[in-house]
């Protein structure tokens, strides 16, 4: 079977946004108009096609990014224009801050993105976070200002906020006509026409009309700004424009596309997905301005086993190259078992092929291959460069692994995942479920790299670690639904860290004599604090064989054993470096083990001398509240050891920004609801680690000692 759609007709893009901006509704409408789902699912009914896990439907939020393939032909006047059918692979990403990791994984495999904003709230904190992630992956994007039918909707305020908050240049290409209940349609600034949605056919048809007199001046002004941005992309067009000639429509689209792909600016459109207005122009804009796999620069990978990770192996969207792909998501499907969502970067993959997982160095066989449409699937026999597919039955592949042709191996990506900041103890309600719970947790951890499961050595308890309370709540919920395990959970605990505050030099001698050969090792260590975030490093400065080479790995092993359990309260130690500068050994009594013990004991003593201190995660908190509650909320944040860093008006509400220790934020949602009669909302994300005040540090040490 040959390729059905040429690569220039592909668009792999994600839909990203803050929680509640209407992202899932947008995806739904896209699937409806592109003919993939026959009735529109509403999030409020708990029936959206993209939100396919039961809990998502209950909570009305999106948790897993489902990947969907659908098709679209550019439409004008409700009739199809003379452009061929494009193939859209859409990834719906979650907007809730606890699931930032999902967004990160999706961005790594997308070519472009549509950022959905709430017309009333504008650029919210999570939007900024996702935007920064997209900047890091250099993803070209456009903005859809959604919910233009809401009270307080303000399109131009959103355009200003995009520029103020993200630093990007926002270029409106379509301006909504009217707002709130008066929303009628859109002025298309490229063709200078009105699109009006009037019928009762769920927005499937619309009419085009000349721009009414009352809107002409505004349309001309914004069209001028758009053309100025576009002609900056091409010297000839700029000269023509300065001589008074505007570019024609195809040229204008070409220049806008060029600027979007180069990340010089971001096209902006408005509408209301819920009211079915403005979705078709959004789809046209995806085709006009977002990249196809051919527009993306070569994907550079490195040779498996290369510790330097020199990225000198190119992979691009070309069927004739060797196969390479990236597994970006694992899902448990009730009918097929484990599904591995994979982006094919180069080459062709056929059913029955054997491929190499170059990240793990293991071979995998391709059993069933599927094209996914939200929650139903189509079996396929081969996949081509640019496709996003699901593979069933892979044994060793986890999120972020590269799959490739064993004859031409490459590692494409090493995904970095943040450390969890919160942990809870969990145990099954009935002892007989212990085994089932362990299996369930292991499968959930395979799906989600930001979730870790560990066993506490001293208490034997199972500990779940994650990115926030909602994150862990949902995982406990999934244990119950998918694995039928009822679990009891303990109170959430903060993931503290330990570090040191000054450099010390410390000598430790380990001597043990008990008849026969004894144990002897002496080490002299310099322990130095490093900058926050630099992590740990070890070096040996031994000269003249004071400690023989073969014992030095033992020294490092001893030091590392202290890293997992620091001297104050047994928390992991971060941001320090150790140098072994001198030592003594004995021809008979010294061994690797003796040096390991000496280094471990030396570190424990040395760290106490080096001013060991506890660190706690500090969260960046933003509370959006009606003005009358600000005084009480600020007072409450301060009482939680928070530092309020500023407040600003946002629409008809106030946004309060603060840094607050995570330890004081548990259950905050309930306090906030009762303080504001349920009208305020907050988001928080991990920002940095800070030293714990001495009195609290003493309490924590007493508790864990």
Swiss-Prot record:
Binding-site residues for GTP, renumbered to this chain: 17-24, 92-96, 146-149
Nucleotide-binding is among the record's keywords: yes
Pfam families per the UniProt record, alphabetical: EF-G_D2, EFG_C, EFG_III, EFG_IV, GTP_EFTU
Keyword Cell membrane: no
Domain of life according to the entry: Bacteria
GO biological process, one term: ribosome disassembly
GO CC terms of this entry: cytoplasm
InterPro entries per record: EF-G-like_DII, EFG_II, EFG_III, EFG_III/V, EFG_IV, EFG_V, EFG_V-like, G_TR_CS
Keywords for the protein's UniProt record, in alphabetical order: Cytoplasm, Elongation factor, GTP-binding, Nucleotide-binding, Protein biosynthesis
Primary localisation category: cytoplasm
tr-type G domain span: 8-294
GO MF, any single term: GTP binding
SUPFAM superfamilies, alphabetized: EF-G C-terminal domain-like (SSF54980), P-loop containing nucleoside triphosphate hydrolases (SSF52540), Ribosomal protein S5 domain 2-like (SSF54211), Translation proteins (SSF50447)
Subcellular location: Cytoplasm
Entries under HAMAP family matching the protein: EF_G_EF_2_B
Role summary: Catalyzes the GTP-dependent ribosomal translocation step during translation elongation. During this step, the ribosome changes from the pre-translocational (PRE) to the post-translocational (POST) state as the newly formed A-site-bound peptidyl-tRNA and P-site-bound deacylated tRNA move to the P and E sites, respectively. Catalyzes the coordinated movement of the two tRNA molecules, the mRNA and conformational changes in the ribosome.
PANTHER family (alphabetical): RIBOSOME-RELEASING FACTOR 2, MITOCHONDRIAL (PTHR43261:SF1), TRANSLATION ELONGATION FACTOR G-RELATED (PTHR43261)
Family stated for the protein in its record: Belongs to the TRAFAC class translation factor GTPase superfamily. Classic translation factor GTPase family. EF-G/EF-2 subfamily.
The name this protein goes by in its record: Elongation factor G
Organism from which the protein derives: Ruegeria pomeroyi (strain ATCC 700808 / DSM 15171 / DSS-3) (Silicibacter pomeroyi)
Name of the gene: fusA
């Amino acid at each position: 079977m040959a390729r059905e759609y040429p690569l220039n007709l592909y668009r792999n893009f994600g839909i990203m946004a803050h929680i509640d901006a209407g992202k899932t509704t947008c995806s739904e409408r896209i699937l409806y108009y592109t003919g993939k789902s026959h009735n529109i699912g509403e999030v409020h009914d708990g029936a959206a096609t993209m939100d396919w896990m039961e809990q998502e439907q209950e909570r009305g939020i999106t948790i897993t990014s489902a990947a969907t393939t659908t098709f679209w032909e550019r439409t004008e006047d409700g009739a199809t224009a003379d452009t061929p059918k494009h193939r859209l692979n859409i990834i719906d990403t979650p907007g809730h801050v606890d699931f930032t990791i999902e967004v990160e994984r999706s961005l790594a495999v997308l070519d472009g993105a549509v950022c959905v904003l709430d017309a009333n709230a504008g650029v919210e904190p999570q939007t900024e976070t996702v935007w920064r992630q997209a900047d890091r992956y250099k993803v070209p994007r456009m903005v859809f200002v959604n919910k233009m039918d809401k009270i307080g909707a303000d399109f131009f305020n959103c355009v200003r906020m995009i520029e103020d908050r993200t630093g990007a240049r926002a270029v409106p290409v379509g301006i909504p006509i009217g707002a709130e209940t008066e929303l009628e349609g859109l002025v298309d600034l490229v063709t200078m026409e009105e699109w009006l949605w009037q019928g009762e056919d769920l927005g499937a048809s619309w009419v085009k009309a000349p721009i009414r007199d009352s809107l002409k001046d505004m349309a001309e002004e914004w069209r001028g700004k758009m053309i100025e941005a576009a002609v900056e992309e091409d010297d000839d067009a700029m000269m023509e424009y300065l001589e008074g000639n505007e570019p024609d429509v195809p040229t204008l689209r070409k220049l806008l596309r060029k600027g979007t792909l180069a990340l010089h600016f971001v096209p902006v459109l408005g509408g209301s997905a819920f009211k079915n207005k403005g979705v078709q122009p959004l789809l046209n804009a995806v085709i006009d301005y977002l990249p196809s796999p051919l527009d993306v620069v070569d994907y550079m990978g490195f040779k498996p086993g290369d510790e330097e990770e020199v990225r000198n192996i190119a992979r691009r969207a070309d069927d004739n190259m060797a196969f390479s792909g990236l597994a970006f998501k694992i899902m448990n499907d009730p009918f097929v078992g484990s599904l591995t969502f994979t982006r094919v970067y180069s080459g062709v993959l056929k059913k029955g092929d054997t491929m190499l997982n170059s990240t793990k160095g293991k071979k995998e066989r391709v059993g069933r291959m599927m094209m996914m449409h939200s929650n139903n699937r189509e079996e396929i026999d081969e996949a081509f460069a640019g496709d996003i597919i699901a593979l069933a039955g892979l044994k060793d592949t986890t999120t972020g692994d590269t799959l490739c042709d064993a004859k031409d191996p490459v590692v494409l990506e090493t995904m970095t995942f943040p450390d969890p900041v919160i942990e809870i103890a969990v145990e099954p309600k009935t002892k007989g479920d212990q085994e089932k719970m362990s299996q369930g947790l292991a499968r959930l951890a395979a799906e989600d790299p930001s979730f870790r499961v560990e066993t506490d050595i001293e208490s034997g308890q199972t500990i779940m670690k994650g990115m926030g309370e909602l994150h862990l709540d949902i995982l406990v919920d999934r244990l119950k639904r998918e694995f039928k395990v009822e679990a009891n959970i303990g109170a959430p605990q903060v993931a503290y860290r330990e570090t040191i505050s000054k450099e010390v030099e410390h000598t430790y001698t380990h001597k043990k004599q008990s008849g026969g050969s004894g144990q002897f090792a002496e080490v002299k260590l310099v322990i130095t604090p490093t900058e926050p975030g630099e992590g740990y490093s070890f070096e040996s400065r031994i000269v003249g064989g004071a400690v023989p080479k073969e014992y030095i790995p033992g020294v490092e092993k001893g030091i590392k054993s202290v890293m997992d359990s620091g001297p104050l309260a047994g928390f992991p130690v971060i941001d320090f470096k150790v140098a072994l500068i001198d030592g003594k050994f004995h021809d008979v009594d010294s061994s690797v083990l003796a040096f390991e013990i000496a280094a471990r004991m030396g570190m424990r003593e040395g760290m106490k001398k080096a001013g060991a201190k506890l660190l706690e995660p500090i969260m960046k908190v933003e509370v959006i509240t009606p003005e009358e509650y600000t005084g009480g909320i600020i007072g409450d944040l301060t009482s939680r050891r928070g530092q309020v860093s500023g407040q600003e008006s946002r629409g008809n509400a106030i946004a309060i920004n603060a840094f607050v220790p995570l330890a004081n934020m548990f259950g905050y949602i309930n306090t906030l609801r009762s303080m504001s009669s349920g009208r305020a909302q907050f988001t928080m994300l991990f920002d940095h680690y800070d030293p714990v005040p001495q009195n609290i540090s003493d309490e924590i040490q007493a508790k864990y000692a």
